[in-house]
Amino acid sequence: MAAPQSRPRRGELILLCALLGTLWEIGRGQIRYSVPEETDKGSFVGNISKDLGLDPRELAKHGVRIVSRGRTQLFALNPRSGSLVTAGRIDREELCAQSPRCLININILVEDKGKLFGIEIEIVDINDNNPKFQVEDLEVKINEIAVPGARYPLPEAVDPDVGVNSLQSYQLSPNHHFSLDVQTGDNGAINPELVLERALDREEEAAHHLVLTASDGGEPRRSSTVRIHVTVLDTNDNAPVFPHPIYRVKVLENMPPGTRLLTVTASDPDEGINGKVAYKFRKINEKQTPLFQLNENTGEISIAKSLDYEECSFYEMEIQAEDVGALLGRTKLLISVEDVNDNRPEVIITSLFSPVLENSLPGTVIAFLSVHDQDSGKNGQVVCHTRDNLPFKLEKSIDNYYRLVTRKYLDRENVSIYNITVMASDLGTPPLSTETQIALHVADINDNPPTFPHASYSAYILENNLRGASIFSLTAHDPDSQENAQVTYSVTEDTLQGAPLSSYISINSDTGVLYALQSFDYEQIRDLQLLVTASDSGDPPLSSNVSLSLFVLDQNDNAPEILYPTLPTDGSTGLELAPRSAEPGYLVTKVVAVDRDSGQNAWLSYRLLKASEPGLFSVGLHTGEVRTARALLDRDALKQSLVVAVQDHGQPPLSATVTLTVAVADSIPEVLTELGSLKPSVDPNDSSLTLYLVVAVAAISCVFLAFVAVLLGLRLRRWHKSHLLQDSSGRLVGVPASHFVGVEEVQAFLQTYSQEVSLTADSRKSHLIFPQPNYADTLISQESCEKNDSLLTSVDFHEYKNEADHGQQAPPNTDWRFSQAQRPGTSGSQNGDDTGTWPNNQFDTEMLQAMILASASEAADGSSTLGGGAGTMGLSARYGPQFTLQHVPDYRQNVYIPGSNATLTNAAGKRDGKAPAGGNGNKKKSGKKEKK
């Protein structure tokens, strides 16, 4: 039976251990604490804040935390008190087995200072384990011939505690044949042996039952028992004997299972069945049992499972040889496991500061790394480095810790994410290495303005565009990210023709697309200069500018405008004269037209669209000059009607037409006489023409009288000014604006001409009365006569009265005629070239406007030389009322003047008219019948 054990109070022991745990010392930069095992979670270990000189409230601010190497956290920091406390139950036997001292090393990291402090904590053992036998029942066989003093080894109890808490003593239950002897080995182990005190007699007692008790020395004392059954055997007086008391073996940890270590042999001098020996392990713990295998018949020992130096480097076991007579022999086996480089280094990222700003200073800490290799010696020595092409480097910290820092400034626009490879290699043979990837994100700052691909842009838009039409798209690129790369577009405000630029153009602030807010007119706006700004959304925002030139392209949207001949306001057509003696190529008149478009759209060509006598006249393709194509014949009609078309070269082409009436005669009186006496020879009802003329004259007379009455009232109001105008060629004063037409800020006075037409009742004669040397330039056409239209005349009542008072009539003014040098055109005295070239300089395009200004100026001062100036258009005074000048815009960039490239002058020439040859008084001219 087990002896009674005293159990002192456990609380006193725990209190003693807790007091010992508060003691610490600082030596070689390390802090030491101690704490009893099996304490509750949160038990106090030491005051970290005090030992580190930090305020407990600033622990979180300094980033103080515990870092360990892949082990379950046994300790924790109390953030309120700054104390190191247990994180859970600590079992010393699980951590350190039966090591005399159980030391746990942890590290305290102060992040803001970049420092590590080593902490060594000793786990103090308490008596929390009972001594334990591997078996509960033990059978011992003893030969009856055994002599007193014979010793029989008994199983040892195992107590995981250490020191006084470990196994201290054995006790054997009282009996008459056996006693207990305890032997202490070199390593301090206590080995119980059963000693035979008296000779056995199987016949008296064949079996004996004993109880062995194992006790420790802790407080309270703990113990356990094993029942021993002793069987007395028949005579077998020799036990197996091993040749060596101790066997030593070295083995590499990477040896495969099945590898033979050695073979042990025990000899038994007995013969027969008493000499047969069986082998088995004795004194082997549970962890060693599955690692090795012993053949009980041969004594061969082999590896049953792979060994690991890092788990255990030394094994000690006892081998027992037993014969059939229960005689035993024992020996020890010591196995040393040698390390091989079979473990790669481990890299643990304890802290990673990501993302990092791209403008961080060199030397900024990016991460803390912990490196460990489970091998020993050189196999466990590790070196770390990064790739040379990255802007980072590793710096050695304390123990096996490294700091990853920057070597230079970073640029997110070049690299936004760094995949940092940390390579750790040991010094073994062959060396083993490990690569660890660290993904570091670089945070963006607004350090790049938006940029355009080009310094300037040019865009084109057709005129007459739709409002809101897309013109051009601008795109600026900002290499920054997120809001620093969000680009908005705007157009710098300016004015164009007095209006804000924003009323013409708008831009989408998000897409950079330009839109037209108005329909552009090429004739008004040729181009726009814009300044577009691209700004990002960073803080502060950055921006850049780019210039954009927007050109308006011309479209053929303006038809040619005919400047000469102009249509009279009374609805009749203008009359042109061609003498019967005209040779082929004689210049009859010239059609002048302009086009407000430009380029090809303003190139004009002339053609004869319709003629009453085909082949008689021709029109210059580029000059617009109407010339005779052949000599005039007597059979040619007196009045020729021509329709001239003017067409530009746009797409599609636009055109305009003008109708010309050409009278084949040498003078206007002849024209009037022959018009009055003209009678178609093919008409069988020739006698009815007189009736038609009488009716027409009566109608015209009624209209004429009404017109004279109205005109008389108007003329009486302006008689004085008109009188001054005729008597003087000086400065015009007080002339109403209705008598002027503006051409480039010049007003030309419109002279009023009058004539009186007197027709007799007969069919072929008429009398013309010219009360003053001025003639109306508008005659009715033959077609109008045939349609019984009234002959329209313009009568100046005041002039007529003035001439009548003087009792005389001036001779006809010869200025109404055309000389060859006075024909319409740029060079009336020369034949035009139908294949003239297009204008190739700005001076040619300004010719028409200069000629119009010169003509208008002469008409204004009363000394018009429209027909007499060399180098002018050759417009005689007879074209004054018909070619009424309107305001002509400045088309110098797009007007083509057909014909000559000669230099224009505005010199005032003298009139070519001769002095009147007739005497005073009225001159009558009777017309002669045309004979065919």
Swiss-Prot record:
Residues 30-692 are extracellular. One of its GO terms (cellular component) is plasma membrane. It is found in: Cell membrane. Residues 804-841, 902-932 are annotated as: Disordered. Pfam families: Cadherin (PF00028), Cadherin_2 (PF08266), Cadherin_C_2 (PF16492), Cadherin_tail (PF15974). Residues 922-932 have a biased composition (Basic residues). Residues 810-841 have a biased composition (Polar residues). InterPro entries: Cadherin-like_dom (IPR002126), Cadherin-like_sf (IPR015919), Cadherin_C (IPR032455), Cadherin_CBD (IPR031904), Cadherin_CS (IPR020894), Cadherin_N (IPR013164), Protocadherin/Cadherin-CA (IPR050174). Residues 30-133, 134-242, 243-347, 348-452, 453-562, 570-682 form the Cadherin domain. Residues 1-29 form the signal peptide. The keyword Transmembrane helix applies. It is a single-pass type I membrane protein. SMART domains: CA. Its main location: membrane. The chain crosses the membrane at residues 693-713. Glycans are attached at residues 47, 414, 419, 545, 685. One of its GO terms (molecular function) is calcium ion binding. Residues 714-932 are cytoplasmic. GO terms for biological process: homophilic cell adhesion via plasma membrane adhesion molecules; nervous system development. It comes from the Eukaryota. Keywords: Calcium, Cell adhesion, Cell membrane, Glycoprotein, Membrane, Repeat, Signal, Transmembrane, Transmembrane helix. Potential calcium-dependent cell-adhesion protein. May be involved in the establishment and maintenance of specific neuronal connections in the brain. This is Protocadherin gamma-A8. It comes from Pan troglodytes (Chimpanzee).
